[in-house]
Amino acid sequence: MDARVSWKQNLSFTGTAESGYELPLSAKADVGGDEDGFRPMELMAISLVGCTAMDVISILRKKRQDVTAFDVNVNVERADEHPKVFTSAVLEYEVVGRQVSETALVRAIELSAVRCCPAQAMLGKIMPIAHEYVIYEDEGDGRRREVVRGRYEYC
């Protein structure tokens, strides 16, 4: 894989990769940035949730789960001192659907964590990554009811 960033001004860049899409990168104003793009560490967090989200929804669809909405959130803790690396992460999978199986969701999370997601594989070598989930029953008209909440643990 090849990627590139091109400097625009101050601490603003445009990133590109083999896919051909452009992505704005920037920094906080207090360090000289224009705040007109993603910060690099934000992109690492988005890469983690994006990678596992694609795995999990693909697996749930293959298992014929009736998912009507799906979000993955991540909370990443960082070191206090520079270079302020990631020290831990908690992924939370929010699934809305009709009779979504907890067993199917846990298996999808497990496959993503241990087999499919290169972002988790890399970041998991340097920090703990916890996995939490919640399943909501889609009751129509934008209404949903929490069915189950849990945590997936792996070594």
Residue ranges of predicted features:
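Extended beta-strand/beta-hairpin segments
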Residues: 1-46, 57-155
